[in-house]
Amino acid sequence: MRPSVFAFLILTPIAAVAAASDGQFSGVSTKGNLSVWRVNHGNGSVSLCSFEGHKNEPQCYPWSAGGQAGNYQIIGGDDVLSTWRINASSGAVSLCEYKEVTDPPICTPWSTE
């Protein structure tokens, strides 16, 4: 195997992990405490996780598209399939919603300041 191909095969997964771990994360539980929305503070992407029964690990669904680097938070709510996110630096908000949990959630454009 050529060194350049070998380096590509080794570095590509490392770059993917670095991109996926952009920033810190937090989350809020939904009503009933059986699901949780999580947010990437660095790029504003959100994802829903849920579980069925204490013997099963949580199942997490695809992440929404991320945005510009910033300081993002999630706003807790009662709806299981949608959540609000806020850019804590600018105050802009956006609503994200799953149409199907097998697809990434669709998010509205950010509000104008």
Describe the function of each predicted region.
Residues M1-S4:
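Positively charged n-region of N-terminal signal peptides that target proteins for export
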Residues A20-S35:
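Short N-terminal segments immediately surrounding and downstream of signal-peptide cleavage
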Residues N33-H41, S82-A88:
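Short beta-strand motif characteristic of blades in beta-propeller domains
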